[in-house]
Amino acid sequence: MSDPQTSMAATAAVSPSDYLQPAASTTQDSQPSPLALLAATCSKIGPPAVEAAVTPPAPPQPTPRKLVPIKPAPLPLSPSKNSFGILSSKGNILQIQGSQLSTSYPGGQLVFAIQNPTVVNKGTRSNTSIQYQAVPQIQASSPQTIQVQPSLTNQIQIIPGTNQAIITPSPSSHKPVPIKPAPVQKSSTTTTPAQSGANVVKLTGGGGNVTLTLPVNNLVNTSDPGAATQLLTESPPAPLSKTNKKARKKSLPAAQPPVAVAEQVETVLIETTADNIIQAGNNLLIVQSPGGGQPAVVQQVQVVPPKAEQQQVVQIPQQALRVVQAASATLPTVPQKPSQNFQIQAAEPSPTQVYIRTPSGEVQTVLVQDSPPATAATASTTTCSSPASRAAHLSGTSKKHSAAILRKERPLPKIAPAGSIISLNAAQLAAAAQAMQTININGVQVQGVPVTITNTGGQQQLTVQNVSGNNLTISGLSPTQIQLQMEQALAGETQPGEKRRRMACTCPNCKDGDKRSGEQGKKKHVCHIPDCGKTFRKTSLLRAHVRLHTGERPFVCNWFFCGKRFTRSDELQRHARTHTGDKRFECAQCQKRFMRSDHLTKHYKTHLVTKNL
């Protein structure tokens, strides 16, 4: 071990491993193997006696072969004599201290501990960012506090902290504007405890706008409260001075990777004036002052940063919100028009002849004539009253001009358009004849337009027209139709209380039926509608059948909100039982009642079937 060259040339019997090199490998003289250099370096450790004492007896070793001498690479001068250097395959030199070597491992192998080199993380900032180290300054005037709410993807909204507002703008915000920090003064090297954890950014006053935008990913929060906060802004690469390089070297080792905290808030002091406008992202906040040296007032609004796949929630505190004091325009009050009352002075109306036709077929002619009212009416209306009060309001009724057709079924004196009852008030019609302004029918007021009242069948029942003269025209049917109906009514006029006799059929289409010798045959009543030819035994049946062809349904149900029409009277009577619930047909065996006789007959058959079983 006295000569290093001879010791490395000798056979190193450390262990039967890959550290040995055969003598035939002459091509590696120019480039020594790293394993060979490691074996040569390890051969310098301690005297052989120590290794023999520690190393346990090994199995018989194979015959060693001669190694080619390898020239070690030159090692740099080390301040310690116990340090060793290892040349890697890439040409790097690793220094190993003597205290890191251990020869007590069994098997004669060498174990040494190599500490991992310190890796400097350079990925905490972007390539195009410039690092500014802003030193806190002493500010004489009272500044406004602004809170910055960092977010993962969005930018930061900065709002003067009179009410401590935090707003996070939408992700689609414009590119941040670089911030130029205030120049560092010599007096700012000594920081005060009151401003050790905050930066001061001064915005120039005046009437111009001030735009301040901070990217979220450029905020670094240090754990040391006394350390200066680092502000990173995106800007084009610029040459760095020596002072900035020194400041970076000092700040990088002390900087720690930022912790992902959702509610982390950094306070920045911004000195603003009354005319400043602060804008961040797509949001705009205008700070105005009413003047006179009064401080600006800002509304307090807090915006919760949105989470993943959630909508942004805006929360307004329950405290009293102070609104920005500014000149506000008072909206003029809308003048309301006073209610107008129409004063109507009715003159002596002329007699009016009214034709009223009920659904049962009755046609009445009424002569209406009223005396002028004592006082003027405040509003002219046409209202609906009950049919019982119709006779009280109508005057001048003459029996000579009235005709009624009495039938077996009960009369239906009511007019039921859409199920409602309509009657005429003669006094109000007389007032409406002079100046008709409003017509009130079933709660619906119509001004200045003619009103036509129809029933559910579509037939015209009553027409009220606004005429220019002093007369009010009320008519339900055309004059020709009224004349025809009056003739039919007068032809069948009978006295009240008399029974209607059955009249013989005089229809030319009707012919005698088959009769035997010596017997009077029955006449057949044939339907004269083309392509029909049906025959009936009774004229009533023929008339009811003809109504099916013509679509005439003279029998109307007078029940409230019903108004159904039928071609035969028995159909109307049968339908009326559905409203009254009358069940006049009773079963003799089980006392079950039915509305219709055919239903009772069908039910009686069930008893016959059970009896036969």
UniProtKB/Swiss-Prot annotation:
Gene3D superfamilies: Classic Zinc Finger. One of its GO terms (cellular component) is nucleus. The keyword Nucleotide-binding does not apply. Its main location: nucleus. GO terms for molecular function: DNA-binding transcription factor activity, RNA polymerase II-specific; RNA polymerase II cis-regulatory region sequence-specific DNA binding; zinc ion binding. One of its GO terms (biological process) is regulation of transcription by RNA polymerase II. A zinc finger (C2H2-type) spans 525-549, 555-579, 585-607. Residues 1-32, 170-197, 225-255, 374-402 are annotated as: Disordered. It holds the Pfam family zf-C2H2. A motif (9aaTAD) lies at residues 361-369. The modification Phosphoserine is found at S78. CDD domains: SP2_N. It is found in: Nucleus. PANTHER family: KRUEPPEL-LIKE TRANSCRIPTION FACTOR, TRANSCRIPTION FACTOR SP2. Belongs to the Sp1 C2H2-type zinc-finger protein family. The 9aaTAD motif is a transactivation domain present in a large number of yeast and animal transcription factors. In SP2, the motif is inactive. Binds to GC box promoters elements and selectively activates mRNA synthesis from genes that contain functional recognition sites. This is Transcription factor Sp2.
